[in-house]
């Protein structure tokens, strides 16, 4: 994604200058301030992308194969996997093309590289937006299944889920195209940051409310069976730990990238902010790490999906 403070990698690859050796250490920025810069080796970047790609392809394949998984909940999980797949794939493609251009193995005119960069940017941005949207959609789906359990199947129907999925994809592509076209406007970056914060607040409110309801339900059961009070306390701690991990991973993986965008608006020339800008590739790597973790949290915990996945893997041998 083209952002101030980070070089557009494909266009920069047309220069014959060799890239710097990846390192973790202190580097001086233009003002002489010492910065902690974490460079992500291209090999590590490609490896993370490949792991994410394989994981999410397996999720999509398993859900597509098993008709028992053709429900609204798994529809959202499948689309989340597809979004994460595109995030990883687009970043892998950009890195691979960059390496080929730097090595001289791929000859291309600047105009062609510019168009390719724009296409990759749109794919990356739209898949990031859709990934955040589907994380929110999964939270809403789970909330309805708990608080409106008796009416769940009449509220969350497959046709409605498909319409929601279509709306998310169309909106993601449309807005990402606008964001890429007007990326140098502060309002565009602020919109992205506000969108991230809105998704974070939505997920936090819904999951905290769900945890409170679950603890209340467990407490009611414990009152009927006084001996199970310790089990109730353990359930509350386990639920709080799960919620902390879920929201913590989301914030840790996505937060630095959107902090980067926020600082571009607030302090584009400040020495401290310039130090943070140098770690842009690290922030992208964290998003790819989130794409690796998502299947573990939302997909592979399903026994039905794991069983289907085993069948798919056994059939492929």
From Swiss-Prot:
Official protein name in the record? Melanocyte-stimulating hormone receptor
Known CDD domains for this protein? 7tmA_MC1R
Is Transmembrane tagged as a keyword? yes
- Extracellular compartment segments: 1-37, 94-118, 184-191, 267-279
Which keywords accompany this UniProt record? Cell membrane, G-protein coupled receptor, Glycoprotein, Lipoprotein, Membrane, Palmitate, Receptor, Transducer, Transmembrane, Transmembrane helix
Annotated glycan sites: 29
Sequence intervals crossing the membrane: 38-63, 73-93, 119-140, 164-183, 192-211, 241-266, 280-300
**One cellular component (GO) term of this entry:** plasma membrane
- Keyword Iron recorded: no
**Subunit and partners:** Interacts with MGRN1, but does not undergo MGRN1-mediated ubiquitination; this interaction competes with GNAS-binding and thus inhibits agonist-induced cAMP production. Interacts with OPN3; the interaction results in a decrease in MC1R-mediated cAMP signaling and ultimately a decrease in melanin production in melanocytes.
The family annotation for this protein states:
Belongs to the G-protein coupled receptor 1 family.
Its annotated function is as follows: Receptor for MSH (alpha, beta and gamma) and ACTH. The activity of this receptor is mediated by G proteins which activate adenylate cyclase. Mediates melanogenesis, the production of eumelanin (black/brown) and phaeomelanin (red/yellow), via regulation of cAMP signaling in melanocytes.
GO terms of molecular function: melanocyte-stimulating hormone receptor activity
């Amino acid at each position: 994604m083209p952002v101030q403070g980070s070089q557009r990698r494909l266009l920069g690859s047309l220069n014959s200058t060799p890239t710097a050796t990846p390192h973790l250490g202190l580097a001086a920025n233009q003002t002489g301030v010492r910065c902690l810069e974490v460079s992500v080796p291209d090999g590590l970047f490609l490896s993370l992308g490949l792991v994410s790609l394989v994981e999410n392809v397996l999720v999509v394949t398993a859900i597509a194969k098993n008709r028992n998984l053709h429900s609204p909940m798994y529809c959202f999980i499948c689309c989340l996997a597809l979004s994460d797949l595109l995030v990883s794939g687009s970043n892998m493609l950009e890195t691979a093309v960059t390496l080929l251009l730097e090595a001289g193995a791929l000859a291309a005119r600047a105009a062609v590289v510019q168009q390719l960069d724009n296409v990759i940017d749109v794919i990356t941005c739209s898949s990031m937006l859709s990934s955040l949207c589907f994380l929110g959609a999964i939270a809403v789906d789970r909330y309805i299944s708990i608080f409106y359990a008796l009416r769940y199947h009449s509220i969350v129907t497959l046709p409605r889920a498909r319409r929601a999925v279509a709306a998310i994809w169309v909106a993601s592509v449309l807005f990402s195209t606008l964001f890429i076209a007007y990326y140098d406007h502060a309002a565009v970056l602020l919109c992205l940051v506000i969108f991230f914060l809105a998704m974070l607040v939505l997920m936090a409110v819904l999951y905290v409310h769900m945890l409170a309801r679950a603890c209340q339900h467990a407490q009611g059961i414990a009152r009927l069976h006084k001996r199970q009070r310790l089990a109730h306390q353990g359930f509350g701690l386990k639920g709080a730990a799960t919620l902390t991990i879920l929201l913590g991973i989301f914030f840790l993986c996505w937060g630095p990238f959107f902090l980067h965008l926020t600082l571009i608006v607030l302090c584009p020339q400040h020495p401290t902010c310039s130090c943070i800008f140098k770690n842009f590739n690290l922030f992208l790597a964290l998003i790819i790490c989130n794409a690796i973790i998502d299947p573990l949290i939302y997909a592979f915990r399903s026994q039905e999906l794991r069983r289907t996945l085993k069948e798919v893997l056994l059939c492929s041998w």
